[in-house]
Amino acid sequence: RDVALDGRREVNDAFRKTVAGTGSYDTIVPKFKALVDERDPNLDYYARGTFTSHNLDFAEDVLSIADAGFDRLSVEPVTADPGCGYDLTEDDLPKIEAEYDRLTDIMLERKKEGKPFTFFHFMVDLDQGPCVVKRLRGCGAGYEYVAVTPDGDIYPCHQFVGKEEYRMGNVFDGSFDMGISGQFAKQNIYTRPACRECWARFYCSGGCSASNLLVNGDISLSNEVACKMERKRLECAIALKAIAAGMGETENTSRNNTECNQCGFCQ
């Protein structure tokens, strides 16, 4: 459902290159646009990008994607090894938070101009939302789904691939470590110390285990930089909902949770 596009040509081509080593923007954008134009209009899609410390003005990349003809967008913070040169740090947060505020203003202005677009991280359901189980533990890595490599090795999700201590088994020999699965199944907003007192816990549902491991070496210890970005996005999302309500608007700016059937608890 997603097509990968990081925004402006120079931003995209810095990381997304062809096999020949050249930038991919001019090749992929016309193809992505044709794909989106021909899709079933009842099916969601997202033009999904990533921002790094090299493009903290990422609202410009959101606008670039929108101006390229896409109206369902997601530009997300990079997950990268600390110190790699493009990872996001605490020092970047003031610029990132200001950019989310700027993006909020841009979206309001675009709406007035009759050129609205959807930004995934600014979607929040204040009326219903997901079931209580999903509010307590949003990520199903390791127990609701797994990642399987071409060699058949099983990991909790794609971000754990190569981390031998989290290899759960192999599809070819039939092995599967239920102990690792149970370790992930026990994760929730009350087992993670930083989540317990966080006002955003029932919207965030505990964050990403892989991100926690990458930054803190423990899937239970929250990545505080990621947490601060999530809280800022939620502030912007709630502000947009409040402004829309004040204008008497009723259009949907919520993620669709009506078809959630992943965990089976509500069946």
Q: What do these predicted regions represent?
A:
Residues R1-R9:
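Conserved SAM/AdoMet-binding glycine-rich loop
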Residues E10-V29, K33, D37-A141, Y145:
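Radical SAM enzyme [4Fe-4S]-AdoMet core and its adjacent flexible, acidic
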Residues K95-Q128, H158-S205:
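C-terminal accessory region of radical SAM enzymes
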Residues D151, Y190-Q267:
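Radical SAM enzyme core and accessory elements
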